[in-house]
């Protein structure tokens, strides 16, 4: 069939640290609301990291029965909830669809550390015979896609991408390709994560990847000269991607069009991005080429923007390498300045952000940004902007050198 089918966004759902729906999340973004606060899941007395961006007031009973909830860890519950919102938002009636042409591409970077910690404690205290039979199906990361498919009767291609912090973006990109090539008419796609646990916080702290600031206003500050690590977040964002003619036939509302997907690998280091930014630059240019858009046509980038020292420096170099002098004309922001780093869900949350920005003609500010160092001399959006957003490019860069970019455009016939 070839790569000639247009793909549009027709539904969205979100469970985030600043709101448990797309509407709540987006209102929070426009208000500059941050989701950072003391970790409540466990006692952090012995931990250097005290803050996280936790989801608040999440009730799985709103989205599933008690039996289903007991058979899912929180990362799966988040995904099923966000997927339900997205499917409802899209007005997708599975009784009217060929279920084998509706697929699922929902990734998690880690899966359930909670299940692993809980059952490891049981192993050490009571022996191997007392480890729960549900450990594996509760823990493994592909169960997000599995549970979403089970919950909503999705019998088409089912994918679980695991590329660390690029997971959500790759998941949406692979769903896009699936529709382009005719293997599905509709894909439920995105990412989910719930890793604010003792071992999760301890492990990322040992990497010196997390911010140790105890001031919520100065913890996640992408591109700021005082940035010192990311704040771990949690949640899920899921979108409904649909082949254009299929969407039009059923009278679906169309939020935006997904027109480009680019990837690369740094092949450089297990945690650090390539210092010259060449890998991320290639992913961005590949997405633009895929979408038939010249670099100088782009006006806005939703950056990976984690608030680590390396990311701020190396992603800036990547943007300059990809766009040359035009880099200075771009508006660049980081959604992580408000919700922290949702790891495998980050790219999906930022994709939803870009869709809303295109829809409303609004570019949010990078909250907490005060002053940058000399090499970080681009426009990182200290202020928000009300303006037409014809295209939005969103970047995700994962441990292991995984780079992915998606290009969205304002939908026109």
Language-model region placement:
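ACP-dependent fatty acid/polyketide chain-elongation machinery
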Residues: 1-68, 245-257, 352-366, 409-413
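A glycine- and small-aliphatic-rich helix-loop capping segment at beta-alpha/alpha-beta transitions
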Residues: 23-28, 114-128, 178-181, 201-214, ...
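Active-site-proximal alpha-helical scaffold in enzymes
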Residues: 79-92, 141-145, 149-193, 231-252, ...
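Conserved beta-ketoacyl condensing-enzyme motif
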Residues: 9, 25, 30-163, 192-201, ...
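Glycine-/small-residue-rich "gating" segment that lines the acyl/pantetheine channel
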Residues: 125-132, 170-173, 177, 193-249, ...
């Amino acid at each position: 069939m070839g790569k000639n089918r247009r793909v549009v966004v027709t539904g969205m759902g979100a469970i985030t640290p600043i709101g448990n729906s797309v509407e709540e999340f987006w209102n929070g973004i426009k208000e500059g609301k941050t989701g950072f606060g003391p970790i409540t899941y466990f006692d952090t007395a012995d931990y250097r990291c005290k803050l996280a961006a936790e989801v608040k007031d999440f009730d799985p009973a709103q989205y599933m029965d008690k039996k289903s909830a007991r058979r899912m860890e929180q990362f799966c519950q988040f995904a099923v909830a966000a997927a339900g919102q997205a499917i409802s938002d899209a007005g997708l009636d599975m009784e009217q669809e060929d279920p084998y042409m509706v697929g699922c591409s929902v990734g998690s970077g880690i899966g359930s550390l909670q299940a692993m910690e809980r059952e490891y404690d049981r192993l050490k205290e009571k022996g191997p015979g007392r480890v729960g039979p549900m450990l594996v199906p509760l823990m493994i990361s592909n169960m997000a896609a599995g549970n979403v498919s089970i919950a909503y009767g999705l019998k088409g291609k089912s994918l679980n991408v695991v590329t660390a912090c690029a997971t959500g973006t790759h998941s949406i990109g692979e769903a896009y390709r699936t529709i382009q090539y005719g293997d599905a008419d509709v894909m439920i796609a995105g990412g989910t994560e719930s890793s604010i646990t003792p071992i999760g916080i301890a492990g990322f702290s040992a990497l010196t990847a997390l911010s140790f600031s105890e001031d919520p206003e100065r913890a996640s500050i992408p591109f700021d000269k005082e940035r010192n690590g990311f704040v771990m977040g949690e949640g899920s964002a899921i979108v409904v991607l649909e082949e254009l003619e299929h969407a039009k036939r059923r009278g679906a509302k169309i939020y935006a069009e997904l027109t480009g997907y680019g990837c690369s690998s740094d092949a450089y280091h297990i945690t650090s991005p390539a210092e010259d930014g060449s890998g991320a630059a290639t992913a961005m240019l590949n997405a633009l080429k895929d979408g038939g858009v010249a670099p100088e046509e782009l006006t806005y980038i939703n950056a990976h923007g984690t608030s680590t020292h390396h990311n701020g420096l190396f992603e800036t170099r990547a943007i300059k390498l990809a766009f040359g002098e035009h880099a200075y004309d771009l508006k660049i922001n980081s959604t992580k300045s408000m919700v922290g780093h949702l790891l495998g869900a980050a790219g999906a949350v930022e994709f939803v952000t870009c869709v809303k920005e295109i829809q409303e003609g609004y570019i949010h500010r990078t909250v907490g940004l005060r002053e940058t160092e000399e090499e970080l001399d681009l426009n990182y959006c200290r202020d928000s902007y009300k303006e037409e957003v014809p295209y939005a490019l969103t970047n995700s860069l994962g441990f292991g050198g995984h780079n992915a970019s998606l290009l969205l455009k304002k939908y026109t016939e």
